[in-house]
Amino acid sequence: MGLQRRSAPSTVRASSAWVCLVTAVFILSGPVAKAGESSCRDVRFEGQTYSTCSSGGNGLTLETFNLSKSGEPYRYFFGLEQELEDDGKVLRFAMNAGMYGEDFRPIGLYIENGKQVKKLNRRNGNGNFHLKPNGVFFIDNGKPGVLETEAFAKSGLKPDFASQSGPMLVLDGKLHPKFSATGTSRKMRNGVGIDDKGKAVFVISEGPVTFYEFAKLFRDGLNCRNALFFDGSISSLYARELGRNDSFLPLGPMVGAFESK
């Protein structure tokens, strides 16, 4: 199945680039309808369109990814797709999953296959990563979760996979305290939440949205009591069901769901 690679001009995310690929769109008037066995779909919530993917209940394996077998960062989805294919696996969806440095390696906690590559980052600083409370997305014995950074540190968890990012979008059912309904900063954004069924729901906006609008989608539209922001400048999605393979900019840590052929 050939996937369409989407690229942007030098002014990445220019307004002319906000184009949704043709898919069924579900209008939300409250919680999102159940997705059934489909892993990805487009939804609308309060006038905005989002693409969502879920790994729960559909036989997919969910993992984080950063370095290829060569020891270099994948940077683009097609590298990950090809490596999985060589191993007899099919990538169903993937997205960028956490912030990184100039070397495309994570700046916060990162765990892959039980190995801690980068330790938990509890420092203060500038930028979205340090807009506390921030948090950790993790997969422990196949079960996904999102915890605020300090809560994760105290939990004693040693998950199989994890990626730290920030800020938290929703924390115990409440929006991040620094988000405002009158906020004016609009960007394409992506993140992950854990819904009331315990499924990880990955979301990318199809147009520029505020932090408040994005967080509200997770809490009120997707029934997520905890959700974590991944990024807002390089947000990218690979979704086989949607025929989509974004290649705007090189990426650092990724999260992806795959199945065996």
Q: Positions of the model-derived regions?
A:
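Bacterial N-terminal signal peptides
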Residues: 18-29
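Conserved, well-ordered active-site substructure
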Residues: 107-123, 178-227, 235-261
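Short, solvent-exposed aromatic-acidic interface loops
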Residues: 67-70, 151-155, 205-208
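Bacterial N-terminal signal peptides that target proteins for export
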Residues: 3-20
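Zymogen propeptides
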Residues: 32-128
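Short, surface-exposed charged micro-motifs
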Residues: 52, 136, 191
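Active-site-adjacent helix-turn-beta-strand microarchitecture at beta-sheet edges
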Residues: 105-179
